[in-house]
Amino acid sequence: MFITNEHVGDRSRMEDWRIRGYDPLTPPDLLQHEYPLTPESQKIIVEGRNAACDILNGKDRRLIGPCSIHDPQAALDYCERLYQASEKHKGELLIVMRAYLEKPRTTVGWKGLINDPDIDGTFHINKGLRIARKLFVQLTSKLPIAGEMLDTISPQFLSDLFSVGAIGARTTESQLHRELASGYHSQLDSKTVPMVLWVLPLTPLRAASHPHHFLSVTKPGVVAIVGTDGNQDCFVILRGGKKGTNYDAKSVQETQEELIKSKVVTEMKPGPRIMVDCSHGNSNKDHRNQPKVAQVVAEQVAGGDKSICGLMIESNINDGRQDVPPKEQGGKDALKYGVSITDACIGWETTEEVLEVLANAVKTRRSL
């Protein structure tokens, strides 16, 4: 129930005169009780976390590979396809489904399934959280999933379902998000959930490895001061940028040297800590270039590179992207099935081809 602020627009008020009102938020523990983890989900999540950490720490020689979701049914369809691929390549690839439900925005636009689940500007966030948790419980009955952390509150509703967490490119320089990464943890065991940090230099990654204190909420929804231990299982993603692409061997080597210089990689922690984003700047924002990026990285892996822990691919059932039609033209009901409404993605057939290339690269590296 939305509680309207009767003083909105009244500049004589000391506070909240720009606030239209409030909608009470469902407490995290209530939502977790409503959609609890199943034994199957718990097993897959923990195994995914442990495997990801083993890869980062050099104990597992596979590669790890994690677009925003707007259609839960299509997400389940995609998950089933990805599960079949993961079974095929499980000896070489740890496949983690990228299940991002919130979309960080540089300006404005649809902010994701949690923020606006009906894709019509109604912002039924409580509904979005319920859809999100129900969907994640279903997805994790098949595969481990990766999620992006945009604030310090939503993880309390969903983080127990993630095997890999991400702090996005727009937020790695934010002190609050570094603090969040330092305490991003498993609710199921004592192992820290691996965290992705997207940018160079490596200051955010070093900061996340240290203890911090920050404001958040508890499971019952009470505001609290959170103290963290620090996260030793962080890794960096190379996504390209204003200076060009950075998936080539020279860029990877320079990043590895920075990781060693920053003591993120040491003799005691020699595992690979570099993931390559095949999309965004590395694809020059053309999704059709993602397989080309993957091929170049696969060649590095096949040649014996041990600093690359994985790749990130923006993939969907069908390729490309689409805009949400105006309401008078059907709105979200007129959307094409399995096509992204945010970043453009490669389709399923191309995804299968890329996974095959990566799996073969791992096999070649093992034979060296």
UniProtKB/Swiss-Prot annotation:
GO terms under biological process: amino acid biosynthetic process; aromatic amino acid family biosynthetic process; chorismate biosynthetic process
Stated regulation of activity: Inhibited by phenyalanine.
E.C. number: 2.5.1.54
Top-level taxon of origin: Eukaryota
Keyword set, alphabetical order: Amino-acid biosynthesis, Aromatic amino acid biosynthesis, Transferase
GO cellular component: cytoplasm
UniProt cross-references to PANTHER family, sorted A to Z: PHOSPHO-2-DEHYDRO-3-DEOXYHEPTONATE ALDOLASE DAHP SYNTHETASE (PTHR21225), PHOSPHO-2-DEHYDRO-3-DEOXYHEPTONATE ALDOLASE, PHENYLALANINE-INHIBITED (PTHR21225:SF18)
Family recorded in the similarity comment: Belongs to the class-I DAHP synthase family.
Full protein name: Phospho-2-dehydro-3-deoxyheptonate aldolase, phenylalanine-inhibited
Lineage: Eukaryota, Fungi, Dikarya, Ascomycota, Saccharomycotina
Gene field: ARO3
